[in-house]
Design a protein with these regions (language model features):
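Primarily secretory-pathway and cell-envelope proteins
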Residues: 2-61, 98-122
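Short amphipathic beta-strand segments in non-cytosolic proteins
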Residues: 62-73
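Short beta-strand segments within Ig-like beta-sandwich modules, predominantly Fibronectin type-III
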Residues: 73-78, 108
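Short, surface-exposed beta-strand/beta-hairpin micro-motifs centered on an aromatic residue
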Residues: 80-86
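A generic structural signal for beta-strand entry/edge sites
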Residues: 82, 91, 113-115
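Hydrophobic loop/turn residues within beta-sheet-rich immunoglobulin-like superfamily modules
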Residues: 87-90, 108-110
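A short tyrosine-centered beta-strand micro-motif
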Residues: 90-96
């Protein structure tokens, strides 16, 4: 792999790890090696989000994570198939939209972390 492919924030053999304002997130899982790498690291992330469509995992999800006061902490235009977010314990609102179909979930992140699954079916 060339240097650009292995640099943080670029596509390649590594998953993407990027800071967004004060929130660090990991987004990827499109290929089998990338998905397996993310699953191995999942326990280290307080909020673990997966996106599924009718045939399987989907990417290109519009994602927003807001705190209990409504302040947006993370906004992605191309989330998935998995997005892990480093958050402090607390209450959050997560909104995910795929092909114009939005879903919103209220989630409490605690010491064990929290898994969220968003599914879109025809």
């Amino acid at each position: 792999a060339d240097a650009a492919a292995s640099a943080p924030g670029t596509a390649g053999d590594v998953v993407l790890l990027k800071p967004a304002a004060s929130v660090v997130y990991l987004n990827g899982g499109a290929g089998r090696p990338e998905a397996e790498a993310m699953r191995r690291d999942a326990a280290h992330w307080p909020l673990r989000i997966a996106f599924q469509g009718a045939p399987g995992p989907v990417a290109g999800v519009h994602l927003a994570v807001a705190d209990a006061r409504g302040h947006t902490l993370l906004r992605l235009a191309h989330g998935g198939p998995m997005t892990f977010v480093m958050l402090a314990a607390g209450d959050y609102r997560v909104t995910a939209s795929y092909h114009g179909h939005a879903q919103t979930r209220e989630v409490r992140v605690g010491p064990e972390g929290q898994d969220l699954d968003f599914r879109w079916t025809p």
